[in-house]
Amino acid sequence: MDRKKKPLDVTASSLVDLKAELFRKQEEFKQEKLLKDSGVFGKPKTINKKPSIWSKQNAGVTSRAEKDAEQKLEEQKTLDKAREKLEEKAKLYEKMTKGDFLDEEVEDMYLVDFTQKIIVKRKEMEVLGATRESQIEEERDDDDKEEFSDKDIPPPQDPSEEWVDYVDSLGRSRRCMRKDLPSLLEMDKNLQGRLFVSPANEKTLLSEDMRKELQRQQWEEEEREALKKPMGPIHYEDIRENEARQLGVGYFAFARDKELRNKQMKTLEMLREQTTDQRIKRENIKEKRKAMLEARLAKLRQKKMKKSKEDGTEEEGREADGVVPEPSEPKPVPAPAPVAQNSKVEVIIQERRDTKPGVPHIREWDRGKDFSFGFWSKKQSELRAERDPEFAPPSNYFVGQKRTAPMSSQPQSRPGSAPSDLGHSSGQSQEPSSSHTSTPASESSPQAPTVTFQTLDDMISYYKQVT
């Protein structure tokens, strides 16, 4: 069939709509053209952009939301049913507690004995009612006692036993016997003094002008009193004028009256003398006790000294007691004569002044520590004989050493004299020994011995051994 000859199924209304749409588009085009010619840009056209990931919803969100809404409706129905059941149970429980049972057979079905509960509750109510009635009766009795008139009080046999009324410091009306009235009034005065409000607290409620006026009045009153008084010395209390400074516990505020001030000063002086006397007495008692203790310690030391002398260990006893004999003052060592170039080198061995005779030297950091100093069980010669010759010092260290001072015949019995015996050798007959004596009875120490060396090497080797 030919297309040109095919009739179009077009109605009149569709043609009118098409013509109207065409006319509207032509008008919009004209308006945009006029705006462009005038330089005014119209509203930009909206462009459909790609939706972002945040605006895009997950698949199945709407279906899940519908399911949630249905589930909420079901839950709400279940909750409503449970609430209705609970309300029915509560109403039934109230009826049963009141005793409104439907039937006795129904009562046996429940595990709770509601009849016994009703009986117990009624008993509790009766007890509470009885206690309330007793309290009400007691209150009435108290009111009746308070409302007794003077006619109900019997006449007193003695005028001092007469009942009287008075008002205390707090504004309360009181009743007591006439004989007790003075003591009660005195107590009331004491209470009123304790409850007195200080003027400083009252002044906080005043304005600045009123406070200044009060200060001016106080100053005028003080000046009038000062004019009435005779001329005399001015004290600190006269010029303090309510100073806010705190002066500490050592400060005493004397009275402004001369007689009272002198009396206070005499009292303070007397107290000071008493304190001084008590302090002196305590010092004297302390000194007496200390002297008695020292005397007892001296007796104990003497006893131990006697025992140690008998045993031949006098020094050990003194060390155990912590008593050390005072060292005798060493005689001044004569200065060595000037040495010639080819003469021998002389070395003078001096005593250590920081140690006591017969007592080993104790370092400062070792004071107060306990040390046990025993005796040599063997002689020095025996020990040197037992020593391995491999560990002995070389014999050439002591070649040419000669002792000019006489050797001490008394052997050393304590290891405290070891520092002076370090230079001994097994092959030498003449050995430098300590010049200290172990007997504390000696009043003066001997002169320091001198050692003569032929060469400087001998002297250095000797000092290596000694130190």
UniProtKB/Swiss-Prot annotation:
Biased composition (Polar residues): 406-415
Residue runs in coiled coils: 64-99, 268-310
InterPro entries xref list: CCDC174-like
Name of encoding gene: Ccdc174
Native organism: Mus musculus (Mouse)
The entry's keywords: Coiled coil, Nucleus, Phosphoprotein
Subcellular location: Nucleus
Residues with PTM Phosphoserine: 198
Pfam annotation, one family: DUF4078
Protein name, UniProt field: Coiled-coil domain-containing protein 174
Domain of life per record: Eukaryota
Acidic residues composition bias: residue spans: 136-147
Entry function: Probably involved in neuronal development.
Stretches with biased composition (Basic and acidic residues): 64-76, 349-365, 379-390
Biased composition (Low complexity): 423-446
GO CC list: nucleus
Region (Disordered): 47-76, 129-163, 301-365, 379-454
